[in-house]
Regions:
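Short, small-residue-enriched loops and turns at beta-alpha junctions
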Residues: 128-129, 199-204, 229-234, 260
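A general structural detector for well-ordered alpha-helical segments in enzyme core domains, enriched
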Residues: 82, 86, 139, 143, ...
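A structural preference for short, hydrophobic beta-strand core positions in alpha/beta folds
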Residues: 35, 98-101, 153, 194, ...
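Structural beta-alpha unit
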Residues: 14, 40-43, 51, 67-120, ...
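Gly/Ser-rich helix-loop-strand patches that form or flank binding pockets
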Residues: 15, 19-21, 26-28, 99, ...
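Small/aliphatic-rich secondary-structure junction motif
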Residues: 1-65, 93, 146, 159-229, ...
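Short, contiguous strand/loop micro-motifs
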Residues: 8-10, 73-74, 97, 127-128, ...
Length: 286
């Protein structure tokens, strides 16, 4: 059962939307909430632009003087703003939580902290990224691939209530994400639509059969759909996104890659396309 939720914060609108979702899930699951702001240690050093006589770049140099004061003041301001956002998010909610600040390499620190959590919640993209790029940020992609935990990716202003959509191809990632997906669906008491792409309907139904039994044993109402035919990666992503729009889905649960016997349905490009345009949070595991 999910008893520990890690919410990664960086001040972006997406991370604050993720915090709201993390608080809601912590309350519904009666789980502990750990809100974490990682101060990027790279903001407190300067990088030499030269190489030494052997052609190697010297180690970064810690900031000093006014530059250090400005960096520390900015970090303190961000910490204060995020703590205020955290307090607002938990106000009046039955949540056991803590707000922590650590300094380190962001991705490395979050991956390490994720090992003490049952669920990681973070925004689709972090602060400071080029607004013209719609896709998930590098920290989000790193967490999906390396956290070894289910990762809930939250867009800014997305739909957060409604049935759950599970694009199912039998791959390792989607098989692993089914367990936390079922727990979340049970907590929300929502139905689950399982969508499979197969060359023949019989292949898709055979692939779905064990999942039918699994959902039934957990009391989850499942709507099983098979789409026949061949499809491109972009077409597969459109299929998922179209189903999410049709269902007014509140969550998509999927694996990040496909290793199944049918044609590849969920690969890196499909993952990115869904994360970029999903109208709701996406729960992922590799």
């Amino acid at each position: 059962m999910m008893k520990s939720i890690l919410a990664a914060l960086d001040g972006s609108a997406e991370s604050l939307a993720g915090l709201e979702q993390a608080v809601a899930w912590a309350e519904r699951l009666d789980a502990d909430l750990r809100a974490l702001f990682v101060q990027d240690e790279r903001h407190f050093v300067t990088y030499p632009t030269y190489t030494d006589s052997e052609g190697t770049v010297p180690k970064p140099i810690p900031l000093s003087g006014k530059a250090k004061e400005r960096a520390e003041a900015e970090a303190a301001r961000e910490e204060s703003e995020l703590y205020s956002a955290y307090e607002r998010a938990i106000k009046g909610r039955a949540v056991r939580g803590e707000f922590r600040v650590v300094r380190g390499l962001v991705e490395h620190t979050l991956v390490r902290e994720a090992h003490a959590a049952d669920l990681v919640v973070l925004g689709k993209r972090g602060r400071g990224l080029d607004e013209s790029v719609e896709g998930a940020g590098p920290t989000t992609e790193t967490m999906i691939h390396e956290a070894l935990r289910p990762v809930l990716v939250v867009p800014k202003g997305g739909v957060t209530s409604g049935p759950m959509l599970v694009p199912f191809d039998g791959s390792h990632g989607v098989q692993r994400v089914i367990v936390p997906a079922v727990e979340l669906a049970s907590a929300l008491d929502v139905s689950m639509t399982v969508l499979t792409l197969a060359e023949r309907r019989s292949d898709g139904e055979a692939l779905q059969a064990p999942l039918r039994a699994y959902l039934k044993s957990h009391g989850i109402t499942g709507d099983f759909r098979v789409v026949e035919g061949h499809d491109t990666e972009r077409g597969a992503a459109r299929l998922i996104l179209g189903a999410a729009q049709e269902l007014h889905a509140g969550l998509i649960a999927m694996g990040a890659f496909s290793v199944g016997p049918l044609r590849e349905f969920f690969v890196g490009s499909v993952t990115r396309e869904v994360l970029t345009h999903a109208p709701c949070p996406v729960l992922m595991m590799t």
